[in-house]
């Protein structure tokens, strides 16, 4: 898929912007604090309806304004598709093909993107919550069912946790109602667990091939999905649900004592294993970066496999974090295949040599200027 056009209105430091992008590699050059990352963030928001940098939507609205608008036209295999996200002080609204959508979950998946930024190294060396967020954001683009189930699970988890807190402090004592809430949570949780197992395995297949190539055949990478539910390729949703129900039953008293759910997909993780060792704990910084790069490139191939179309790739000041060798592997892998947006203070070295016919924009104080070839 291709993002052909992007329009911004009162978004961060952009008062008004209308730009047409090239289908290949688009390079956004500018000094810090000029708006490069804001532009990539707007593309990300057009895909996910939210920022990857802040949970406070008010920060996205321009100074002294009440409404920010991000809209664009996506060229998909099925044709042109207009998308729009409106952010106001009172909430958020989205449009697909000029029609408002009742639920945000029906919007995600119309524009697929893979973001690679310096902070994405936390995917490998950070806390498990980073990897759960990664699964939900990336797998949610590929499967509307997965996104819907994760949304349902989080809502029901919050409800159960609130009820467990009331139990802890003696404000509730209805075990039958707790059982009903728990049964509902287990039903959707089992579906989430099985979907994650299947998708992590497929992602791992692509990541292993890429990592083997990037490491020059010196290292072997595997991804292990870690869950309290014992799942493998043959586990059905019904079996996972039954396991969760049993685990909740066995741990009910302990959960009441803690006032929160101790069992479920909200405790899941992914382990990255390089040559038999957990790279999160024992890997060098170079191994962690190679792993992060392999996983990000694997996302692209998995999305193509799942949806039939390549996603957009957003590279936010990430080239400066990679050595020449890793830059070469990254740029070679995406060349002439994926519409890419690169932010940088300058295009030099390996990147300038490897990028074929880039479309270059300079950004200064929220103003975008296309360089003539």
Curated annotation (Swiss-Prot):
Chain coiled-coil ranges: none
Binding of ATP, residues: 30-37
Species, as recorded: Limosilactobacillus fermentum (strain NBRC 3956 / LMG 18251)
Record's keyword annotation contains ATP-binding: yes
Localization per record: Cytoplasm
Any single Gene Ontology cellular-component annotation: cytoplasm
Keyword terms of this UniProt record: ATP-binding, Cytoplasm, DNA damage, DNA repair, DNA replication, DNA-binding, Nucleotide-binding, SOS response
Protein function: The RecF protein is involved in DNA metabolism; it is required for DNA replication and normal SOS inducibility. RecF binds preferentially to single-stranded, linear DNA. It also seems to bind ATP.
PANTHER family with a match to the protein in the record: DNA REPLICATION AND REPAIR PROTEIN RECF
GO biological process entries: DNA replication; DNA synthesis involved in DNA repair; double-strand break repair; SOS response
Pfam families found in the cross-reference section: SMC_N
Family statement: Belongs to the RecF family.
NCBIfam families per UniProt: recf (TIGR00611)
An example Gene Ontology molecular-function term: single-stranded DNA binding
Broad class of where this protein is predominantly found: cytoplasm
UniProt protein name: DNA replication and repair protein RecF
TM segment ranges: none
